[in-house]
């Protein structure tokens, strides 16, 4: 199946590059669009929704580190990135909103295989929330 718009959900860890590489390898043969999203679940009480990184007045809401990391991932992707998004709040809801708004048909996300991920898995939450195809990539920390 050829996907038309792939959304990569990144946590901005060094392993995020693996997700970008995987999505690019799937998008390139079909000239599919790729977008990046980072959802900060730590500030859910402050703001819920999407912020387009390209909008000047909204950039103030995004930490400089997050903006820099998303820009670096986008620049080093080796493939055009259509949208670079940052959101806050419930991970599943922010992704569902982005999927609807930008007509995405595949979500690529990572799953850290560590102790904490066994207790609180973002991937498990997404499986029960997102209604498009998903690719869950197992990630290992760089020091392993």
Curated annotation (Swiss-Prot):
The keyword Nuclease does not apply. Required for resistance to DNA-damaging agents. One of its GO terms (biological process) is response to stress. Keywords: Cytoplasm. It is found in: Cytoplasm. CDD domains: USP-A-like. SUPFAM superfamilies: Adenine nucleotide alpha hydrolases-like (SSF52402). One of its GO terms (cellular component) is cytoplasm. Belongs to the universal stress protein A family. Transmembrane segments: none annotated. Homodimer. The gene is uspA. InterPro entries: Rossmann-like_a/b/a_fold (IPR014729), Universal_stress_UspA (IPR006015), UspA (IPR006016). This is Universal stress protein A. The keyword Ion transport does not apply.
């Amino acid at each position: 199946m050829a996907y038309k718009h792939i959304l990569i959900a990144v946590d901005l860890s060094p392993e995020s590059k693996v997700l970008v590489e995987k999505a690019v390898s799937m998008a390139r043969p079909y000239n599919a669009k790729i977008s990046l999203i980072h959802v900060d679940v730590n500030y859910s009480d402050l703001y819920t929704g999407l912020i387009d990184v390209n909008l000047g007045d909204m950039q103030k809401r995004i930490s400089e580190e997050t903006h820099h990391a998303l820009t670096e991932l986008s620049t080093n992707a080796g493939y055009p990135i259509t949208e670079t998004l940052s959101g806050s709040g419930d991970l599943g809801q922010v992704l569902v909103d982005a999927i609807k708004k930008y007509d995405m048909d595949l979500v690529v996300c990572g799953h850290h295989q560590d102790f904490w991920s066994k207790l609180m898995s973002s991937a498990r939450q997404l499986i029960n929330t997102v209604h498009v195809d998903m690719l869950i990539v197992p990630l290992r920390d760089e020091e392993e």
